[in-house]
């Protein structure tokens, strides 16, 4: 039987991960269907056309994020009941269900109990759970009893060759008001609470790097975090912000204009922004968490600091700034780490997980 898969949610335009995955799955003979609606009616209507339901972020299907805040909790629990019913119908109709677990809990949560229940329901209903790293696989086995035998570790693919290189380094720095001899630390990605912007700014300032510059680029999705960044940028020229969605043609040039990339998120799971940095040959400064240590090869492609500790981050940034020769060595290692995340192999493993037994 041919494998015909539908993604839930459909591929997100502003994140190329899903598009890259399904493009390479097509090369493996997997047919990728158009956007599906996870309803009982859709499940019945498409049973002869679709073999596999592939979930990525299940919170889209049980959270209720509209209307009065006071009613959202109750309505979310009602949606969770519908989610459970639909999963039960999907199993009884014979669909294969696969969940790629980007992180065990959503980035921001108004109810950990709700999100834990949603994860438990989907994990129980899934034939296969795909973890992007070993630490997520371990968390799945520990927190969702009975899931260990169904977990497969298939890493996040690289972004090598996805983004055009863009303008020269000197031109980009000049445009941003950053001097040519500055040591530039890049934080790239959506501005959200779980990214710990306060730790990032405090750690950078505590590092006291001569001619250091912190470049923060990404779409602001959290008003409080964005205001904090704007205030920090207004207090001194060493912090530069590009608080907007960065189009594809502008992504690589920001990394090329920087010396290291930094991430301060501690929610677990594999960071797509960290994979992007490695793919563009930029070493990363990241928390000492198993997923990041796995990604950097135990620090060969970056530096690590104690999670949530601004002082430890400052020390790691000083180390990164201290030696251009060490940075160059780690930059080569970064690209080598990214080259191991080849999409053809990842797609082959994912295709095997998606195929009906």
Protein language model regions, located:
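Glycosyltransferase donor-sugar binding loop
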Residues: 188, 213-227, 244
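Conserved donor-binding/catalytic core segment of Leloir-type glycosyltransferases
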Residues: 179-195, 201-204, 215
């Amino acid at each position: 039987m041919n494998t015909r898969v539908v993604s839930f949610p459909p591929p997100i335009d502003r994140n190329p991960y899903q598009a890259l995955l399904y493009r390479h799955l097509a090369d493996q003979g997997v047919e990728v269907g158009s956007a599906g609606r996870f309803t009982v009616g859709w499940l019945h209507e498409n049973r002869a056309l679709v073999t596999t339901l592939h979930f990525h972020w299940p919170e889209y299907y049980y959270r209720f994020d509209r209307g009065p805040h006071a009613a959202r909790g109750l309505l979310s629990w009602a949606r969770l009941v519908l989610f459970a019913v639909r999963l039960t119908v999907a199993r009884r109709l014979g669909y294969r269900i696969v969940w790629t677990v980007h992180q065990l809990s959503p980035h921001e949560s108004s109810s950990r109990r709700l999100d834990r229940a949603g994860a438990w329901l989907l994990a129980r209903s899934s034939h296969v759970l795909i973890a992007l790293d070993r630490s997520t696989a371990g968390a799945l086995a520990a927190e969702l009893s009975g899931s260990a035998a169904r977990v497969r570790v298939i890493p996040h693919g690289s972004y090598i060759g996805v983004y055009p290189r863009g303008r020269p380094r000197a031109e980009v720095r000049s445009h941003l008001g950053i001097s040519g001899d500055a040591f530039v630390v890049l934080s790239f990605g959506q501005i959200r609470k779980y990214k710990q912007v306060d730790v990032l700014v405090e750690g950078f300032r505590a590092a006291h790097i001569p001619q250091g510059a912190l470049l923060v680029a990404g779409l602001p999705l959290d008003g409080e975090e964005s205001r904090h960044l704007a205030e920090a940028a207004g207090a001194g020229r060493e912090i530069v912000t590009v608080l907007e969605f960065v189009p594809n043609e502008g992504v690589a040039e920001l990394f090329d204009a920087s010396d290291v990339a930094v991430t301060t998120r501690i929610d677990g799971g594999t960071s797509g922004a960290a994979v992007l940095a490695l793919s563009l040959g930029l070493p990363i400064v990241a928390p000492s968490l198993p997923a990041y240590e796995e990604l950097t090869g135990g620090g060969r492609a970056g530096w690590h600091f104690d999670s949530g500790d601004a002082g430890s981050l400052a020390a790691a940034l000083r180390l990164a700034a201290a030696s251009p020769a060490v940075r160059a060595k780690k930059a080569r290692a970064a690209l080598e780490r990214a080259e191991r995340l080849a999409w053809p192999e990842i797609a082959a493993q994912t295709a095997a997980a998606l195929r009906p037994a």
